[in-house]
Structures are given as structure tokens and as C-alpha cells.
Amino acid sequence: SYEIIIKTLQDQRLQELFTSVVYGSSKVASYHRKALNINDFNFNLVKKADQAHPRRPNIVNIHDEEIKLDLGKSTSIAGELALLSLEAACEDLVKKNIDAVVTAPINKNNIQSPGFSFPGHTEYFARKFGADNYLMLMVTHSVRIGVVTGHMPLSKVKDTLTEELIIKKIEVLDQSLKRDFAIHKPRIAVLALNPHAGDEGLLGDEEKNIIRPAIEKVFERNILAFGPYPADGFFGAANYRHFDAILGMYHDRSEEHTSELQS
């Protein structure tokens, strides 16, 4: 995470857009900076977020002790510090000391603890802030893609999908497009689960029995959702250009196309 954060904040243009506050260890950050041979970058060390310098990258120390680092290897202390950083950022978010949180990558294995028993950030934030209806949404300049089932093994996706769950995710996506992206009447494309959208039941019946009924019900509520579309043909024909957002059934299928379109 530190490598990504440091290299990102080296871009001085970002400091003109927002005041950056990193929650972590200044000593660990310094170690990474030296290991990367980055000499033209330093964090402004502050005790609290409200002391942040508006024109410099700031860091709030959540741990000031010496830490033995072995770059590229997972350690328990790394997971502990990642959780401490996340908790400190959430606390400041609640207190309105900061306006938003951007999460850097975590090791989802070494962060597991009594305070974090989640498959990812999305589920942690949902529990932390009491959100029953939430959605993982990946956004690029050209596409917005939401995910119904999020972080879970592919083997569990089929049994997790329900008409009610898909309806909830479509509704959350519709609300987000209107509120966060100021789109008055958003158009949402819903992707199929099975190849060729099930091929009339030959390759699976989730499209006919679960996904299509969910789309029809939200459409009756004036939500402009369409589908289900086979993912390969949908993206291959660039049909995503005709919609404001896309809802995929599972994580990797959605993220795969987001990455392709971003590159």
C-alpha cells in the first residue's frame, strides 16, 4: 500500500484537488520511500487530520514504534496496522474531520482478527456504518460497474443469488447514479450469470427464474434496467456505451471488464 500511496501522491496536481491525509506509520512510510529510491517526496507528519497542511501530503501516525519490515512478505503486524489505520480513518470520518476515505490494497488474510472478519473493505464499511443495502461499484472514465455478490468464492455465487438481492442491488445502483453522478434517468444494463444468458435454460436457468423477474419488477417501479445480457457479447459489441451503469452478478467477471476498459 505504501508504494502505491507514495507514487500516487508524488503527483503534485492532486494537492490542488484535495488535502490528502494518510493514516499509517511515518517510519514504515519512510522505509518504503528509501527502498524505492524516492528522494523528492516527504510526508508532513501531523497528530490529527484537522492539522493537515492543505498543499502537502500528510500522515497521521497510528503507530510510532519501530517495526521490522521484510518487503514483499505478509506479517501479522502489517495486518494489525492496516486495521488500526482503517479504524482511525473511520473515526475521523464520523467526526467529520475528513470528508471521504480512499482505501489502498490490504492483505485480506493477515488483517483477519476479532475486529475484522470480512472478505474486504466493502463489507467492513457496511457493518461499520450500519448499511443494510450497499454495493461495490467500480468506476472508470468510460464505465461504471456494480457487483451483486461481491467478495465470495465463485462456488457460492449461484446459491447466493436471489430475486430479492438483485432487486436491492439495482435499486442501490439507481439511487447512486441519481445522487452521486447527477444522472436524472439512468439506464442500467444487467449482466447474465451463465454463458449466452443461459441459452433458454440449456446452460442454466438463473436468468429465466431469478434475474429477468428482478429486472421486470424494478422496471415496473420506473427504474430503467435492461437485460440480462451475456457479458462477452455485451462488452465485445461495446454495448456498455448505451448505458449509465452495468450490474454484474459476481466480482471477477465485473472487475475483469472494468480493467480491460480502463487499459
Where are these regions (language model features)?
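Contiguous, glycine/small-aliphatic-enriched amphipathic segments in soluble metabolic enzymes
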Residues: 1-120, 164-249, 253-254, 259
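Flexible loop/hinge segments that line or gate small-molecule binding clefts
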Residues: 116-145, 150-154
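Active-site glycine-rich loop that binds ribose-phosphate moieties when present
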Residues: 123-132, 154-178
